[in-house]
UniProtKB/Swiss-Prot annotation:
NCBIfam families linked to this entry: PRK04750.1, UbiB
Active-site feature positions: 287
Enzyme Commission identifier(s): 2.7.-.-
Name the UniProt record assigns to this protein: Probable protein kinase UbiB
Topological relation to the membrane, as annotated: Multi-pass membrane protein
Pathway: Cofactor biosynthesis; ubiquinone biosynthesis [regulation]
InterPro entries: ABC1_dom, Kinase-like_dom_sf, UbiB, UbiB_bact, UbiB_kinase
Family of the protein in this entry: Belongs to the ABC1 family. UbiB subfamily.
GO CC entries: plasma membrane
Transmembrane portions of the chain: 499-519, 520-540
One Pfam family named in its UniProt record: ABC1
Length: 549
């Protein structure tokens, strides 16, 4: 490790100790002299004993800076790992940092564009529109078409700083994994690696631009979602240029009510958008917190969402999508045996899992939820509780499913904030049933046949030759297998005969040795020893020489 890494490591440990996070560890894991060591090496006392563990961790991450703040935000969505109290505290972390010098922003933008800002843009505003831990946003006007745009540029040295902190996080996670028995259940290394993949993806603004364009194309004809146009020719790994939008933050309910927005329709459209992204497009926005979502000012009676920040996107494979849809349908049909079967069939839990025990565990979690009205049941919490239950059966929650569960919780929270009476099931059920029918019904089978028709048409002329070759090969294999079986049987016969003779000779030799000690039976001892030697020789000669079949 470099000196800089050691210094940062010391700073991280000192901050964690300052907030007394060593208190949350089991006392048996820390040596008796640990408190003295803490005072001597780090000069800190725990002055936060009056605060709960979750609040202490939140304060520590705020002090450690942007990388740890975003890590805390990610942890707040892992309610399959953390208690509700800890997750709730971490969810209050805010990714807000002071803006960096606009001169540095100009320098970074011009380095990416390889051209002066004034040659491409008018009215570049040196005062940032927004500033976050990874990037900063400035406004300008495109010279080519007069369109108002925003320029999102990475902070100076952000990549090096993030990678250094990630390396340290992985080392700490590895240590925790070894130290704690609980560490195996929490899987700290897996959690940090998941976060690493997420945040490193956010460092590539060119990738974010491609994600935004793909999502925009998926909803070009939609009256429910609008994604701002991205100027891909001006986008680079450290710079993204996109259309500037004017909308109302989704969390500003007062402003939405003031313009007469149809909140019921808006809430229902949010649910439909989620299921459309997941099941129709298999490409969903996985960071749909209120700061990334705005509502159109036009047509408040027919409102649409405006989505920003496509740095984190998710997708599921076809099987996971089907299992997920069946899971939801089975839950609302109260078919807990089917839910347990689906978890095993999907590979989310081990095939040797006790289905009946798992079914009972699922029933204990799900059945109390039906005491609530349907419009109070949360899909996200259903999925979350199923993950928590399955974790007791050694489930490894896939990162994409965690992203989906987090997104579903966001969507539900927003929907019920907009319209508290939102009946999620009433909105989602027709969509899920229609999607399932499309996947397994006659139309789906015909579509799959139609899709694969060119391939099979190309292969059809080869079928007679393939059948003949396979029959010929099968005949050869059958003959060779019969020969191998014959050789194996002969080998076994020889081996049994040899073993029998060798065991018999051993018995004769032992008996001869015992009899030899008695002077009145020397003749019998000699006979046993001689016979034993002869039988041993016969057994040795008859043993099989070749084990190859």
């Amino acid at each position: 490790m470099t000196f800089a890494s050691l210094r940062r490591g010391y700073q991280v440990i000192r901050t964690l100790l300052h907030y007394g996070l060593d208190d949350v560890l089991p006392p048996t894991l820390l040596p008796g002299y640990f408190k003295l060591l803490r005072l001597c090496l780090f000069w800190v006392r725990n002055r936060h004993k009056d605060k709960c563990g979750g609040e202490r961790l939140k304060l520590a991450m705020q002090e450690l800076g942007p990388v740890y703040i975003k890590f805390g935000q990610m942890l707040s969505t892992r309610r399959d790992l953390l208690s509700d109290e800890w997750a709730q505290e971490l969810s209050m972390l805010q990714d807000r940092v002071p803006a960096f010098d606009s001169a540095l922003a100009r320098e970074a933008i011009e380095a990416e564009l390889k051209a002066p800002i004034d040659s491409l843009f008018d009215d570049f505003d040196d005062t940032p529109l927004a500033s976050a831990s990874i990037s900063q946003v400035h406004t300008a006007t495109l010279k080519s078409n007069g369109q108002q745009v925003v320029l999102k540029v990475l902070r100076p040295n952000v990549e090096a700083n993030i990678k250094a902190d990630l390396e340290l996080m992985l080392q700490v996670a590895t240590w925790v994994n070894r130290l704690l028995g609980e560490g195996n259940r929490l899987r700290p290394v897996e959690v940090v690696e998941d976060y690493q993949n997420t945040i490193l993806g956010e460092l590539n603004l060119k990738l974010e631009a491609l994600n935004a364009t793909k999502l925009r194309n998926n909803f070009l004809d939609s009256d429910a979602l609008y994604i701002p146009y991205v100027y891909e020719e001006l986008c680079h790994p450290r710079l993204m240029v996109m259309e500037r939008i004017d909308g109302i933050p989704v969390s500003d309910i007062e402003a939405l009510n003031a313009q007469g927005t149809n909140l019921k329709l808006l809430a229902e459209r949010g649910v439909e958008l989620f299921f459309t992204q997941v099941f129709r497009d298999n490409f969903f926005h996985a960071d749909m917190h209120p700061g990334n979502i705005f509502i159109s000012r036009e047509h408040p009676e027919n409102p649409f969402y405006i989505g920003l920040d496509c740095g984190i996107m998710g997708s599921l494979n076809e099987e996971d999508k089907r299992y997920l849809a069946e899971n939801f349908l089975a839950f609302f049909n109260r078919d807990y045996h089917r839910i347990a079967q689906l978890y095993v069939e999907s590979g989310w839990v081990s095939a040797d899992t006790d289905i009946l025990a798992f079914e009972q565990a699922v029933k204990l979690v799900c059945e109390p939820m039906f005491n609530k009205p349907l419009n109070e049941i949360s899909f996200g919490h259903v999925l979350l509780e199923l993950f928590r239950t399955a974790r007791r059966f050694d489930i490894v929650v896939q990162p994409q499913l965690v992203l989906l569960e987090k997104t579903l919780l966001y969507i539900e929270g927003l929907g019920r904030q907009l319209y508290p009476q939102l009946d999620l099931w009433q909105t989602a059920k027709p969509f899920l049933e229609r999607w399932m029918a499309e996947q397994v019904g006659p139309k789906a089978i015909f579509k799959k046949v139609q899709t694969n028709l060119p391939f099979w048409s190309d292969k059809l002329p080869e079928f007679p030759e393939l059948i003949y070759d396979n029959l010929k090969l099968g005949r050869k294999l059958l003959g060779s297998q019969q020969q191998m079986l014959d050789r194996y049987l002969k080998y076994q016969q020889k081996a049994h005969k040899s073993n029998f003779l060798l065991i018999t000779s051993a018995v004769l030799l032992i008996c001869g040795t015992i009899l030899f000690a008695q002077t009145d039976t020397l003749w019998l001892a000699s006979a046993c020893l001689g016979s034993g030697a002869l039988v041993w020789g016969a057994g040795w000669r008859s043993r099989p020489k070749n084990r190859k079949f």
